[in-house]
């Protein structure tokens, strides 16, 4: 913020003409004698913490007014003080707050924002009569008040006991996943738990899945054919999951105008981790979730109780978060990502709680399907929890029965966010750190902010909205899968992805030239059955071909020699059933192999292999 403070004999103004960004004002003219006139330009940096800039501006104005012994203050918006202006919506709010904060101790006259104004001023002309100040969002160190913080509990779903977390409880916890999540929540760091890059970073490069794009911003990736296939299969999986449960797919823009009050208020709640930029006279942002577009769409819908619960789903390709460069870690923390995002409109809290429970089980199902077990934490405001204890205990009991696990419960003393309740589910990586993926949140604020209403007879009701990502970002899902693959190696198992997600599900390797024709027939039969199979026709030794198949994490490696041609029984190495130093082999007919792979994949999404069938002509991407 830039300010110009003038000790004035008088300031007189008259608003002449509106601009497009003018506020509706009751006071269009005014005069104040013996005053401190404060010309103010609100800048873009002020948007990061409007409360702080208001506080700092008021302190500076009060200090100057007291030094000059004046009790009259004019607040005058004056854009010409800066070439880096903040959004009009933010400026209006900040100016109004400054007026409000000063009004208790001073007579305040505020000129309207966004009008062409005529003004006259008489400066007193003494050494302190003209002062310019740069006001920042820096928060000065305040006297620390006793702060009420969240309380954390372990909930045993068997006997429904809540045990408040303390050092003794932490030392006795046996569930490594739950312990890792709890330590993360309590910000307990242990030396030696992080050494170098997490394994998935090596895997994404080595397996030609994806890599950083050096010509883009940090945290943005290029995706190679194998990685694009995996990401598309994961996207197909979530699409099927939500559509089967009544989700209606939509698509909304990635960019939004911050002059829209609802958009800006929702964006400001997320803090500084945003891509914001100016284009022409517009202040724009890149979305960090699909909330913005879906809420604007719901605002324009004529919603009735019979439509509830109404679920809109979007795979936001992409969402953007301007994470700190030092925090960027592979697929776990990046700046552009693919987020499956469903928002459910509910007529009341009862319906919202029913939907919350359904979506909890949907999220947990994804961990079952990916074979990446979750640790979970419920978070509720104290008031909400006290009113709905029985409902929560019912979920905790069912969770214990289904998964045999306890959960963490966080109780917040009051509502700090737009939600009163949420659940987060996390996979634990090889460093013992949680990768938070699925989430469900009960939003009690956004419907009113965005003007979303349900027409219930003669009444207009602001509904409850659930935010749900059934898997978390697609990139984090893959991160969890790859970290889990590494953890398998610590248990003497070869690293692997689930067969339905592995780019090359089967590879056929002929022992010699005379076996190639038969081997090619086998590969074609596999492909005709919807299996992603390729054919290793490279002029390498048999040992190298088998090792290459292992490096590529091929699930089923088929070797064809004389015996296989004579008997029709193929020698198949099954990766998922093997040990690191001991391959599991079976003799299977082509039909038996097709049946085994089909049974392995079950009803998971299917896509063809986006690479040439012959390994000799498959390009190398890095």
UniProtKB/Swiss-Prot annotation:
| Record bears the keyword Protein biosynthesis | yes
A Gene Ontology CC term for this entry? cytoplasm
Write down the required cofactor(s). Zn(2+)
**Region (Editing domain), start-end ranges:** 1-141
This protein's UniProt keywords? Aminoacyl-tRNA synthetase, ATP-binding, Cytoplasm, Ligase, Metal-binding, Nucleotide-binding, Protein biosynthesis, RNA-binding, tRNA-binding, Zinc
Pfam families, per database record: HGTP_anticodon, tRNA-synt_2b, tRNA-Thr_ED
Location comes to: Cytoplasm
Signal peptide bounds: none
The note describing how and how many cofactors are bound reads: Binds 1 zinc ion per subunit.
Question: What are the GO MF terms of this UniProt record?
Answer: ATP binding; threonine-tRNA ligase activity; tRNA binding; zinc ion binding
What Gene3D superfamilies does the entry give?
Anticodon-binding domain (3.40.50.800), Bira Bifunctional Protein, Domain 2 (3.30.930.10), D-tyrosyl-tRNA(Tyr) deacylase (3.50.80.10)
| Entry's EC annotation | 6.1.1.3
Give GO BP annotations, semicolon-separated. Answer: threonyl-tRNA aminoacylation
Catalysed reaction(s)?
A: tRNA(Thr) + L-threonine + ATP = L-threonyl-tRNA(Thr) + AMP + diphosphate + H(+)
Q: Where is this region: Catalytic?
A: 199-498
TM ranges are none
* NCBIfam families hit by this protein: PRK03991.1, thrS
Domain comment, in the record's words? The N-terminal domain is an archaea-specific tRNA-editing domain that hydrolyzes incorrectly charged L-seryl-tRNA(Thr). Catalysis of tRNA editing is performed by the charged tRNA itself.
The record describes its quaternary structure and partners as: Homodimer.
Family of the protein in this entry:
Belongs to the class-II aminoacyl-tRNA synthetase family.
Q: What does this protein do?
A: Catalyzes the attachment of threonine to tRNA(Thr) in a two-step reaction: L-threonine is first activated by ATP to form Thr-AMP and then transferred to the acceptor end of tRNA(Thr). Also edits incorrectly charged L-seryl-tRNA(Thr).
Q: What is this protein called?
A: Threonine--tRNA ligase
Read off the lineage from the record: Archaea, Methanobacteriati, Methanobacteriota, Methanomada group, Methanococci
**Gene from which this protein is expressed:** thrS
């Amino acid at each position: 913020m830039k300010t110009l403070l003038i000790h004035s004999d008088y300031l007189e103004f008259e608003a002449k003409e509106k601009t497009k960004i003018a506020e509706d004002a009751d006071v269009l003219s005014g005069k104040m004698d013996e005053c401190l006139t404060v010309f103010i330009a609100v800048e873009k940096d002020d948007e990061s913490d409007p409360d702080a800039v208001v506080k700092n501006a008021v302190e500076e104005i009060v200090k100057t007014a007291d030094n000059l012994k004046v009790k009259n203050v004019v607040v005058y918006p004056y854009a010409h003080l800066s070439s880096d202006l903040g959004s009009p919506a933010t400026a209006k709010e900040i100016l109004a707050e400054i007026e409000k904060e000063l009004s208790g101790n001073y007579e305040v006259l505020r000129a309207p924002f966004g009008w062409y104004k005529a003004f006259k001023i008489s400066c007193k002309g003494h050494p302190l009569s003209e002062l310019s100040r740069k006001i920042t969002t820096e928060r000065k160190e305040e006297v620390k008040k006793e702060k009420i913080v969240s309380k954390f509990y372990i909930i045993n779903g068997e006997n429904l006991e809540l045990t408040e977390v303390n050092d003794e409880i932490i030392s006795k916890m046996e569930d490594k996943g739950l312990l890792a999540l709890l330590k993360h929540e309590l910000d307990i760091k242990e030396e030696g738990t992080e050494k170098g890059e997490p394994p998935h970073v090596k895997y994404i490069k080595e397996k030609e899945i994806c890599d950083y794009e050096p010509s883009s911003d940090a945290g943005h990736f290029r995706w190679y054919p194998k990685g694009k296939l995996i990401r598309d299969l994961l996207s197909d999986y979530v699409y099927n999951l939500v559509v089967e449960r009544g989700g209606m797919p939509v698509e909304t823009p990635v960019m939004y105008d911050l002059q829209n009050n609802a958009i800006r208020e929702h964006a400001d709640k997320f803090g500084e981790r945003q891509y914001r930029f100016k284009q022409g006279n517009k202040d724009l942002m890149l979305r960090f979730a699909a909330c913005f577009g879906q809420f604007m769409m719901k605002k324009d819908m004529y919603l009735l109780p019979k439509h509830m619960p109404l679920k809109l789903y979007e795979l936001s390709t992409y969402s953007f978060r301007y994470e700190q460069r030092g925090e960027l870690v592979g697929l776990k923390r990046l700046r552009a990502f693919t987020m499956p995002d469903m928002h459910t409109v509910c007529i009341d809290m009862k319906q919202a709680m029913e939907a919350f429970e359904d979506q909890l089980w949907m999220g947990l199902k994804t961990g079952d399907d990916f074979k990446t077990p979750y640790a979970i934490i419920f978070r509720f405001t104290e008031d909400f929890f006290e009113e709905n204890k029985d409902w929560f205990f019912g979920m905790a009991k069912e969770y214990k029965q289904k998964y045999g696990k306890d959960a963490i419960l966080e109780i917040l003393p009051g509502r700090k966010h737009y939600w009163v309740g949420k659940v987060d589910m996390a996979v634990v990586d090889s460093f013992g750190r949680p990768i938070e993926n699925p989430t469900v949140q009960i939003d009690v604020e956004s419907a009113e902010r965005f003007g979303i209403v349900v027409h219930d007879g003669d009444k207009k009701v602001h509904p409850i909205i659930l935010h749900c990502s059934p898997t978390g970002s697609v990139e984090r899902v893959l991160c969890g899968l790859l970290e889990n693959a590494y953890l398998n190696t610590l248990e003497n198992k070869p690293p692997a992805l689930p067969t339905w997600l592995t780019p090359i599900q089967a590879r056929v390797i002929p022992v010699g030239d005379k076996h190639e024709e038969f081997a090619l027939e086998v590969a074609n039969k596999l492909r005709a059955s919807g299996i992603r199979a390729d054919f290793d026709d490279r002029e390498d030794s048999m040992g190298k071909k088998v090792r290459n198949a292992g490096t590529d994490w091929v699930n089923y490696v088929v070797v064809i020699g004389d015996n296989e041609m004579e008997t029709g029984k193929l020698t198949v190495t099954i990766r998922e059933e093997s040990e690191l130093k001991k391959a599991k082999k079976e003799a299977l007919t082509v039909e038996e192999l097709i049946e085994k792979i089909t049974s392995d994949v079950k009803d998971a999404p299917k896509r063809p292999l986006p690479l040439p069938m012959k390994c000799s002509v498959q390009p190398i991407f890095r």
